[in-house]
Amino acid sequence: MNNVISSKDNHNHTLVFTGKGGKYFVICLVNFLLTCITLGIYAPWAMVKCRRYIYTNMTLNNQPFAYKATGGALFISVLLVFIIYIVSLSLIEHGHPGLGFTLFGLLIAIIPFMAVKGLQYQAMMTSLNGVHFGFQCSMRRAWWYMFALPVLLMVALYIVLYIISLVTIAVGGLVFSIVFLGLLAIIGIGVINGITYSKWMTLFGNGANFGIHRFSIQVNVKTCIRGCVLAMLTLFPFAVVIGYLIAPVFTDMILLSMMGNAQAGGALILQYYGQIMACYFLYFLAIIVVTSYLYVALRNLFLNNLSLANDSIRFHSSVTAHGMLWRLLVVFVISGVTLGLAYPWLKIWLVSWLAQNTQVQGDLDSLELTNDEKPLENSPLMWISRGIMPYFPFI
């Protein structure tokens, strides 16, 4: 193993992705065929092969990443979770609802613990220049940030909206109440997302390591909330237009129902078919717009505040919301038109763009490359969690 990561430029190192769409297409095609033939059993191996191709073709200063996870480990994990789920349903259906719901509830409650163990496994299976990544954090804190806090915030938002609705309906009427409460709900969800994601960033950033070196991060909660609220507010104009287009449909359907002519609903749908399809289009467009803005805001906030080895190495993300938006639109539209055949090329194109806008800043020559000798945990919880791959929109 090399003792240092060699570099000509010790200040700014851009990730380079060398993957090819044609090769990735062959991998995806073989994976799809084998997954269909095996009725889905091959899916974990397919996932590992796709991820391994992405990792091994991603280089930092001419050093490729490595990914050593196995499809067998993921398959056993998914199988164990599936068995627990089936057993709980079987208990409910065969006269033991208390025991069945308890088992199912426990499975839901330990999802944060499984996410942590899944992150540990994925980190240990990822390496750069022979040095493995790692992840450790408090299980109690993970459960609070990933499960309890979001649930409590959503309950609090529901209570606040319910109390406000009692006032707005009496003062401004039904239409005003719907619009006002809709706007408040969007803002409230943005605030909840901002608080939750800021805690997740802190948990993940301060819990990760590269060999013997620790990552660290300081996230401004207000900045995270502002980014999430602005992302959610992009939904509002779409919601207004969709409501304007779809309101006549519901109004006419209610009138037909009151007149006892509900059977004419089919003809009514045909009459408003264009407006209904426009609503579907605007709905999916709104999702892409929100996803683009939210992903860019969170990714830039996370990477631009992340550091390694006592701030000697820092990271920078320069992706833009408009760049992400039009790329996602191209991915969805062309993938849909080609029935998914173009997706491998588009995925490689998107990953390459993300790599070009990700930099590592610092003197990599002086970074000691020594593995953390802590072995991979082999507990039952780890076995059941290896197939859990939590998605964080800021990575």
Curated annotation (Swiss-Prot):
List all topological domains (Cytoplasmic).
1-24, 93-95, 168, 251-275, 349-395
Which InterPro entries does the protein's record reference? DUF898
Q: Which parts of the sequence lie on the Periplasmic side of the lipid bilayer?
A: 46-71, 117-146, 190-229, 297-327
| Superkingdom of the source species | Bacteria
Q: Which UniProt keywords apply?
A: Cell inner membrane, Cell membrane, Membrane, Transmembrane, Transmembrane helix
One GO cellular component, as annotated: plasma membrane
Has the keyword Kinase been applied to this entry? no
**In what way does this protein cross or attach to the membrane?**
Multi-pass membrane protein
Main localisation:
membrane
Q: Which residues cross the membrane?
A: 25-45, 72-92, 96-116, 147-167, 169-189, 230-250, 276-296, 328-348
UniProt source species = Salmonella typhimurium (strain LT2 / SGSC1412 / ATCC 700720)
A Pfam family:
DUF898
Q: Where in the cell is it found?
A: Cell inner membrane
* Name of the protein in its database record: Inner membrane protein YjgN
